[in-house]
């Protein structure tokens, strides 16, 4: 594989995470405007975004098999057509049913693209380089989370319709589509089987269950928190721009945290530092919810920084629970995290309807506490130390 080809594939991976990050994170910024557009209460409108999350979950789950049947390049190019159709559906329809269908299609497209992006990084890089590349790739999710709420706030403040935010997100997929030209993708399925030796089956252990629960609770807690921060902030009397700035501050700090921890983590036992980070994140989130308006930006900045390495560390620890990293094990933990994404508004929507945005934030805080408990319990059963021991010579 040429270096030019490797760079193109790596950038496709980066942008695939940016696409999903933009679609998921911008929800909290545009939800109120979309609710007004369809003349619905915000809590009811939030339920329709479950279609986006369901599309992401289904596509990530199915693409483990789909990647061996349909070539990756074909998937990405067909995804571009679906993306254009979905954005057009958002722009030209006033039907709630078509809006939900378009959201589901956007979820399918982003889930397939992100699973391809993850696969490409694991194929292109080995060992420690793979871990650092995955963390850097994941930072594009956060980068999109920093940029697109600002784009949304800019457009909405000028009375530009909310669907233009999704048109802007579509430009990310346009870049992916352009990169597929003149680019060779790794072979999969029957074409790749002859070069792969059979891998002995290995029991996962109870530590994987702890990590799966932690992944689900972390993503559900994180998205439940960040999706309702704008509504919570507006309820305190903050402007739309200031509310959007809180979300952008979180993801900017999250992005810098990922870059910092890609160096820091190698000096510590992963399970121990993960437990410390999960505990700190739970405390910082509580301080944000109960603090004054003046302190909120500082708490959300530190929360973003210290929580940035949690999810990638959960996945990395999962891959270290067996001697040979199991793609199915990693996919299982990723799927649990994606279930957390799908449940975001299923869980928080009714809470907001009955108790308000602050109750949703406190629920997210409780989920972060569960992550801390799972990471602490993992310390008694984790196999990562014995499996990584032979490698340190």
UniProtKB/Swiss-Prot annotation:
HAMAP family, alphabetized: MFS_TsgA (MF_01044)
Entries under Pfam families matching the protein: MFS_1
Entry similarity comment: Belongs to the major facilitator superfamily. TsgA family.
Organism encoding this protein: Salmonella gallinarum (strain 287/91 / NCTC 13346)
GO cellular component, one term: plasma membrane
Principal location: membrane
Membrane topology per record: Multi-pass membrane protein
Compartment list: Cell inner membrane
Source taxonomy: Bacteria, Pseudomonadati, Pseudomonadota, Gammaproteobacteria, Enterobacterales
Domain of life from the UniProt record: Bacteria
Keyword line: Cell inner membrane, Cell membrane, Membrane, Transmembrane, Transmembrane helix
Annotated S-S bridges: none
Record protein name field: Protein TsgA
InterPro entries for this protein: MFS, MFS_dom, MFS_trans_sf, MFS_TsgA, MFS_TsgA-like
GO molecular function: transmembrane transporter activity
Residue stretches spanning the membrane: 11-31, 51-71, 78-98, 101-121, 134-154, 162-182, 206-226, 245-265, 273-293, 298-318, 332-352, 361-381
């Amino acid at each position: 594989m040429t270096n030019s080809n490797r760079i193109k594939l790596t950038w496709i991976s980066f942008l695939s995470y940016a696409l999903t990050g933009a679609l998921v994170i911008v929800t909290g910024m545009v939800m109120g405007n979309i609710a007004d557009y369809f003349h619905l209460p915000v809590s009811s409108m939030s339920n329709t975004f479950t279609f986006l999350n369901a599309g992401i979950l289904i596509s990530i789950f199915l693409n483990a098999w789909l990647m061996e049947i349909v070539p990756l390049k074909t998937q990405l190019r067909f995804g571009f057509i679906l993306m254009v159709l979905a954005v057009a559906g958002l722009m030209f329809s006033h039907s709630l049913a078509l809006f939900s269908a378009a959201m589901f299609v956007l979820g399918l497209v982003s889930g397939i693209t992100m699973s391809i992006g993850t696969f490409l990084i694991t194929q292109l890089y080995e060992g420690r380089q793979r871990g650092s590349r995955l963390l850097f790739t994941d930072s594009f999710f956060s980068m999109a989370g920093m940029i697109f709420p600002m784009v949304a706030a800019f457009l909405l403040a000028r009375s530009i319709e909310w669907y233009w935010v999704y048109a802007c997100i579509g430009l990310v997929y346009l870049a992916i589509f352009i990169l597929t030209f003149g680019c060779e993708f790794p072979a999969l399925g029957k074409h790749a089987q002859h070069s792969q030796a059979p891998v002995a089956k290995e029991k996962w252990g109870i530590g994987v269950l702890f990590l799966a629960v932690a992944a689900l609770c972390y993503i559900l807690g994180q998205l439940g928190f960040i999706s309702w921060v704008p509504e919570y902030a507006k309820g305190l009397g903050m402007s739309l721009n200031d509310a959007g700035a809180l979300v952008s501050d979180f993801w900017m700090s999250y992005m810098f945290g990922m870059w910092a921890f890609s160096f820091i983590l190698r000096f510590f036992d992963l399970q121990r530092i993960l437990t410390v980070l999960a505990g700190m994140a739970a405390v910082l989130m509580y301080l944000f919810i109960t603090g004054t308006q003046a302190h909120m930006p500082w708490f959300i900045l530190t929360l973003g920084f210290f929580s940035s390495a949690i999810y990638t560390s959960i996945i990395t620890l999962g891959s270290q629970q067996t001697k040979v990293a199991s793609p199915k094990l990693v996919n299982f933990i990723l799927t649990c995290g994606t279930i957390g994404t799908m449940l975001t508004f299923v869980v928080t929507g009714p809470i907001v309807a009955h108790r308000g945005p602050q109750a949703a934030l406190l629920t997210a805080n409780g989920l972060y506490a569960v992550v801390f408990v799972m990471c602490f319990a993992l310390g008694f059963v984790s196999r990562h130390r014995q499996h990584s021991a032979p490698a340190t010579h």
